């Protein structure tokens, strides 16, 4: 039986509970209405946002946090829907909840603009976090009523324009994060008056070139300043060094000049300094040595000089990066005493002296790169003392002595590059067994010993490069167990025995170099199973037997050198199937007639030193003659001379007027492939009737030879006003296509460089360009509308061609004019990337990336040009990735990049991004909406080309390819995948079906 006291307590709780429930009912109705009218929840994460008889309080709903407010009422204070995959516009209606102070909607697909008028409902907010969505338009303005706003995070959206002046009035603001938006203007000085700021992040914004405002030095509470990749110029203002609470200073990837201020030593709390990839000069200030809290220090890729001060070397750094500068002098021994050192990169400098012996003894060093310096002496024996070392890179120094035995016990090690040193002695036996992905000991070392069978334990090894040493013994059969091998370079050693026939197991091989050894036996025909092989060099050995005809089955082989061996037999005609850029079988014992396809001047040196080979008209190769033919040589020769003389006289009479009118042509002909025609077969066909296209650099002709073969001939403009451009196009096409061999890149067969004009001869693509097939309005076109299977195949093929240019060509090539009109289609609709008139070679970097190249003008075609052309002259292969993303969108939509149906100031990228989200847009904030109109998350029927008849499976596949296209067309190059990754993603999308 309850006592009076207990009864009173029970009734009080019951009354309070009822009051709390009633007070939150209004919040529940607001939330439910916003969900129905403004948000789309494809994954059903908000399915519990339902008002029922037993569940009228939202405090237990997903993403909702309630607190007891004044008056003992339970009310909604926080809405956090981050990562729930919701779409729609900004939910202004949330702000009708009077007690709401925090909104977090990060990592969703929300889009549209954020308008100032309805946003005023949210003036009581303290935290507004909208990172990683697709909001666009101008940054939202904030009225003076937003006096309590402390955190504003809008990172990784699509906001444009300048930072509004109203942001300077948000005096309570502690965090401002606008990272990764395509804003313009400059870093505004008024931000320096937001003195409560602790974090300011304006990284990865394409501001106009401008200096760092000195007013930022007023932000005395700032702990985190990020201005990475923000187009900053000028010197680092000394006022920044007044920020004594600063823990992170990131000014990397800009164009800052001048010296690092000596006053940097005042940043006594700083943990990380990132100044890499600028144009800073001078010496490192010794005052940096006073920063005892500093753990990450990166000043790489600048123009810094001088020696490394011992005081800085003594800092307890975790990451220490000085690479790509002009530092000189020795490396202080004290750097080895650092117990925190994990990453040490000082490559591409001019350091001298020896490496400190105790490096690695006191720290768990993981990555060690001292390459391209002038270090001498021995390798530090304790680098892997703590068993954490993963990468050791020491190439291009003068290091000597043996590889320490201790390295053989370093099972954490997976990447070794020690080429171009003076190392000697035997490689430790256990060294070969390490779980490496790359082992490079090549060039100018004097290492010796043999490759043990235990190398099979290095199961993930992809590159084995040990050329120019004193290695000997046989090539172990166990090498064939390394199924990930892409490169084998054993050249310029003393290996004996035969090439293992099990080489056919290495399906990923791309390059095999075994030249200048003492290998004997026969070339294994099984090598024909290595279908990725592009280069095979077995020259200067003692190989016997015949050339395997199976070599002709290697689909992408473009370099074959078998010279200086003891090979016998005839040259297999099957080799004519290869698309060879380099071919050499000279100095062997080959005999018989050279296959007709090789009987060209370009191949003449390839056959020298084989006295028993013969071919007509290929001096100094002897002509092929039989004994029976010899008796008839004289009379036949006389008859031929008489006939030829008569023909010449007749020809002279017929063409005499032409000779009077026109001087003799002097043309330089270069042949890049085996061809059965000459320039004289082409000249007469360059008529107006055969023109099939024209462009900025010249006319394109369709030329059909008497043999039935059809060619495409590009005749470049020769007029004075256009000669410079045509010369540039001619040179670019020849320098790129002349050495590129890939199944998805158009073949350049021949070029003619004459006084009157230049022309380039290509294989003819029967189905024209992808742009013609997709967009042609001619009703008589032979090509029917492309189905999705064909479009997808074209996308993958074109991606593979571009991937080859970016990642497998040496040097890498950026196309700069990727578009649907430059993707040609053969009779099987197989794509070929074409038109390399704007192509540029890039410099490959050590980390397998490529450097930027400066462009004097914007290159490319309207609708395909990457956004970064608008704010920088330095572009890299990521501009091609953007253009390819546009092509993917063309394949999906069937529309041109700037189709008028998109509306004013909108291109195919914006159209696809908006259409992909497919959310309802009610006219009023709380306006009603027909739920039947929602459909699926992505209503692709409004996006895809209506000419395609698609199955459900194909719709799903298109949605996945659309994701790849939108990734490729990201506003920031750093967010775009490489073309190699694009190929992987596309193939993954197909394999998922």
Swiss-Prot record:
Residues 654-993 are cytoplasmic. LRR repeats lie at residues 75-96, 99-120, 124-146, 148-170, 172-192, 196-217, 221-243, 245-267, 269-291, 293-315, 316-338, 364-386, 388-410, 412-433, 435-458, 460-481, 484-507, 508-530, 532-555, 556-579, 580-601. GO terms for molecular function: ATP binding; protein serine kinase activity; protein serine/threonine kinase activity. It is found in: Cell membrane. This is LRR receptor-like serine/threonine-protein kinase HSL2. Glycans are attached at residues 60, 85, 102, 111, 134, 218, 221, 290, 303, 348, 470, 537, 584. The modification Phosphothreonine is found at residues 678, 872. It is a single-pass type I membrane protein. Its main location: membrane. One of its GO terms (biological process) is lateral root morphogenesis. Belongs to the protein kinase superfamily. Ser/Thr protein kinase family. GO terms for cellular component: plasma membrane. The modification Phosphoserine is found at residue 856. Expression is restricted to the abscission zone. It comes from Arabidopsis thaliana. The chain crosses the membrane at residues 633-653. The modification Phosphotyrosine is found at residues 762, 804, 864, 871. Residues 686-992 form the Protein kinase domain. The active site is at 817 (proton acceptor). Residues 1-28 form the signal peptide.
